[in-house]
C-alpha cells in the first residue's frame, strides 16, 4: 500500500528554511517542476503553475493545482506575475528563458529524471532552489523508504511490453523502463536493443509473446496513432495474459508519484505469477 504523500507544502510538519534563503514568489512553467514545487514549497511561496498541471490525464496533482493560478509559459505573462524565481524543465522554449533572463528574472532549469536516484536528486534540487531543504529531505526519506519495500521483493521476472501509440516503446534507460524494473518485470524492449525509445512493429510484438502488454489510457477523441493498441493482435495477447492500461499521470514525471505506478506494476506481476503454472 502506498502511504499518502504530504502535499502542497504541508510536508509532515517539517520546519521551514530561514526567510533570507526563501524566494518569496516562485513561478513554475513545466509539468514536472509544477509537481515537485507543490510538494516542497512553503505556504504562499509558489504563485503559479503551468496550465498542464490541472490536466488529470497528465498531472498526478491536478486537484492540488486547482489552488494555483496557471500560466502558459509566455514570458510576458510570467513577467507580470513579478516572480523572483522561475523554475522550468530543460526542454522549455529557449526564447522564453532568454527573455526572462534579460528581464532580470532568475530562471532555474531541471533536467528530467530517468532513474529512481535522479528523482531524489530532483527533489533535493527543488529543496535547494526554494530554500526548503528540510521539507525536501523529509520527502526524500519517505520516498526512499517506500521504494526500498518494492526493491526488497525478489523473484522471477515476467516479460512485459510497453506499447504506446504508433507502436512506440521505452527501454530500461527511461523512467517507464525503471518503473518496470523496480516492480520486478523484465522489459522486452531490451531484447530488441532499445535502451531509450523506439518502435516495435506489431508482428515483432506478436512473435515476442510477452507475458503482459502495458498500454497508455487513450486520450479523448479518435487518434489514428492509437489504433494500433486496439489491433486484434493486441487483443489476442491481452486475452492470453493479464494486462494493464496505465495511468499516464503517474508515469510522466520523475516525482514520488511513480511509487503508485510501481505499486500497480507489482500487482500486475503478482497476477501474472499467480496465473503461470
Question: Which stretches of residues belong to each language-model region?
Answer:
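Basic- and aromatic-lined ligand-binding clefts that recognize polyanionic substrates
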Residues: 22-38, 134-183, 276
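Sec-dependent signal peptide recognition
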Residues: 1-8
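Extracytoplasmic ligand-binding site segments that recognize negatively charged/polar headgroups
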Residues: 95, 112-125, 159-178, 221-222
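Short helices/loops that flank or line small-molecule/ion binding pockets
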Residues: 75-83, 103, 199-209
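His/Asp/Glu-enriched short active-site or ligand-binding loop at hydrolase and phosphoryl-transfer sites
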Residues: 50, 56, 175-197, 242-245
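Short secondary-structure boundary segments
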Residues: 30, 90, 112, 192, ...
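Structured C-terminal subdomain patch of bacterial secreted/periplasmic proteins
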Residues: 24-25, 118-128, 137, 212, ...
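A short, structured surface patch at a secondary-structure boundary
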Residues: 25-91, 185-188
Amino acid at each position: 500500500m502506498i502511504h499518502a504523500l504530504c502535499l502542497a507544502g504541508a510536508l509532515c510538519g517539517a520546519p521551514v528554511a530561514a526567510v533570507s534563503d526563501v524566494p518569496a514568489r516562485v513561478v513554475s512553467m513545466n509539468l514536472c517542476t509544477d509537481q515537485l514545487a507543490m510538494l516542497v514549497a512553503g505556504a504562499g511561496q509558489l504563485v503559479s503553475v503551468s496550465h498542464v498541471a490541472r490536466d488529470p490525464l497528465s498531472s498526478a496533482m491536478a486537484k492540488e493545482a486547482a489552488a494555483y493560478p496557471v500560466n502558459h509559459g509566455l514570458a510576458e505573462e510570467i513577467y507580470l506575475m513579478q516572480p523572483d524565481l522561475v523554475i522550468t524543465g530543460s526542454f522549455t522554449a529557449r526564447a522564453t528563458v532568454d527573455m526572462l533572463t534579460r528581464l532580470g528574472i532568475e530562471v532555474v532549469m531541471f533536467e528530467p529524471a530517468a532513474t529512481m536516484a535522479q528523482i531524489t536528486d530532483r527533489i533535493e534540487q527543488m529543496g535547494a532552489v526554494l530554500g526548503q531543504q528540510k521539507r525536501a529531505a523529509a520527502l526524500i526519506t519517505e520516498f526512499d523508504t517506500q521504494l526500498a519495500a518494492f526493491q526488497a521483493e525478489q523473484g522471477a521476472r515476467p516479460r512485459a511490453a510497453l506499447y504506446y501509440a504508433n507502436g512506440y516503446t521505452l527501454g530500461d534507460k527511461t523512467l517507464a523502463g525503471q518503473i518496470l524494473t523496480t516492480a520486478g518485470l523484465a522489459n522486452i524492449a531490451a531484447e530488441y536493443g532499445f535502451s531509450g525509445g523506439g518502435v516495435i512493429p506489431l508482428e515483432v510484438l506478436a512473435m515476442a509473446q510477452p507475458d503482459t502488454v502495458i498500454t497508455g489510457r487513450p486520450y479523448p477523441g479518435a487518434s489514428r496513432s492509437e489504433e494500433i493498441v486496439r489491433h486484434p493482435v493486441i487483443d489476442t495477447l491481452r486475452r492470453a495474459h493479464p494486462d494493464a492500461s496505465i495511468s499516464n499521470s503517474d508515469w510522466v514525471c520523475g516525482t514520488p508519484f511513480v511509487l503508485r505506478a510501481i505499486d500497480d506494476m507489482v500487482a500486475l506481476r503478482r497476477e501474472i505469477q499467480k496465473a503461470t503454472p
